[in-house]
């Protein structure tokens, strides 16, 4: 499978033409272009991951205590408006903000790997690990950090993932949501 980057407007148009859950971008484009579409029935997921809503479903699980070393004031430094404006699209802004978070707390950044959907892996230490979890993950490296993130989520999901990461690092939820809105 090949990967291409498309702008936000084109992405939204393609996504709006989805007819069934799990339909790939290739299937949608084939249908729109009048090309043959394989009618292989894909397995439907049992649940769709929504990080911002998953906290509402309590599940007993071990949650390690994480020491946070980033002062609340430092989170305001996370957003360099000039550099953020130079990023290309939502994916670029998402990656830039994650890399900025890494710069604030390099030693504890590995805790970001704990952020996962119910059946979805969002962060990993390698591209291959994300592709193994989902062939359509479209993994991107977070700067030169050695950490990778899946980018095939819509902008709202990217915002929810970023906000969850910020809160995990000790950021106030209101500040985290404000920063995430910049994606």
Curated annotation (Swiss-Prot):
Keywords: Cytoplasm, DNA replication inhibitor, DNA-binding
InterPro entries in UniProt: Arc_rbn_hlx_hlx, Ribbon_hlx_hlx, SeqA, SeqA_DNA-bd_C, SeqA_DNA-bd_C_sf, SeqA_N
Gene Ontology terms: cellular component: cytoplasm
A Pfam family: SeqA_N
One GO BP annotation of this record: negative regulation of DNA-templated DNA replication initiation
Record keyword Cytoplasm present: yes
GO MF, one annotated term: DNA binding
Subcellular location: Cytoplasm
Signal peptide (from-to): none
Highest taxon above the source species: Bacteria
Quaternary structure and partners: Homodimer. Polymerizes to form helical filaments.
Protein name: Negative modulator of initiation of replication
Primary gene name: seqA
């Amino acid at each position: 499978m090949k990967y291409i980057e498309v702008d936000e407007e084109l992405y939204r148009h393609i996504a709006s033409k989805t007819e069934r859950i799990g339909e790939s971008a290739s299937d949608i484009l084939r249908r729109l272009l009048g090309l043959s579409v394989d009618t292989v029935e894909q397995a439907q997921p049992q649940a769709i991951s929504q990080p911002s809503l998953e906290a509402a479903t309590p599940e007993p699980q071990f949650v390690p205590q994480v020491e946070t070393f980033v002062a609340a004031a430092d989170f305001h430094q996370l957003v360099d408006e000039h550099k953020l404006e130079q990023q290309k699209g939502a994916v670029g802004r998402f990656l830039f903000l994650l890399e900025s978070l890494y710069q604030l707390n390099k030693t504890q950044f590995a805790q970001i790997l704990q952020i996962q959907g119910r059946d979805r892996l969002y962060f990993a230490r390698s591209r291959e690990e994300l592709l193994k979890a989902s062939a359509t993950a479209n993994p991107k490296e977070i700067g030169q950090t050695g950490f990778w993130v899946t980018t095939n989520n819509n902008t709202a999901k990217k915002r929810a993932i970023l906000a969850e990461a910020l809160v995990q690092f000790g950021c106030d939820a209101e500040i985290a949501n404000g920063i995430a809105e910049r994606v």
